[in-house]
Curated annotation (Swiss-Prot):
Induction: Induced under anaerobic conditions. Present with 1300 molecules/cell in log phase SD medium. This is Uncharacterized protein YDL241W. One of its GO terms (cellular component) is endoplasmic reticulum. The lineage of its organism: Eukaryota, Fungi, Dikarya, Ascomycota, Saccharomycotina. It comes from Saccharomyces cerevisiae (strain ATCC 204508 / S288c).
Length: 123
């Protein structure tokens, strides 16, 4: 999220500027989209932590919002909080995330051979 000279505007990726009439949902969705576009990094260079503005599960009111599955915030949030929440949610919802080992493990192969030998001796 690039802040411009005007404090009421910001740029979210290639989506252009959003004026002061933006909603928290727009900012969150923009963060999710940017998070999905950003490649996974082994040691990320960004440091966005949104756990600091979570407050558990207060009663529903216009001053609270849900950050993915992480609960509600209080009324002290700013636009960057919504963006950070969306960005990290987007990073977590990438498809093909994580390491997938396509080779069988050696212990599984050993167990299979041992199991076959036991069955062979019983029969």
């Amino acid at each position: 999220m690039n802040v411009t000279e005007n404090a009421l505007l910001f740029k979210c990726g290639s989506k252009g500027y959003i004026n002061q009439t933006y909603t928290p949902t727009e900012i969150y969705n923009c963060g999710v989209a940017e998070g999905k576009k950003t490649a996974k990094e082994k040691n990320p260079t960004y440091s966005i932590f949104y756990d600091t503005f979570l407050t558990g599960q207060p009663a529903e009111s216009p001053e609270t919002f849900t950050c993915g599955s992480h609960g509600f915030t209080n009324a002290s949030y700013v636009a960057s909080d919504f963006y950070a929440c969306g960005f990290l949610q987007g990073k977590g919802t990438e498809t093909n995330a994580g390491i997938h080992n396509t080779r069988p493990s050696h212990s599984l192969a050993k167990f299979t051979i041992l199991f076959m030998l036991v069955l062979y001796t019983i029969v």
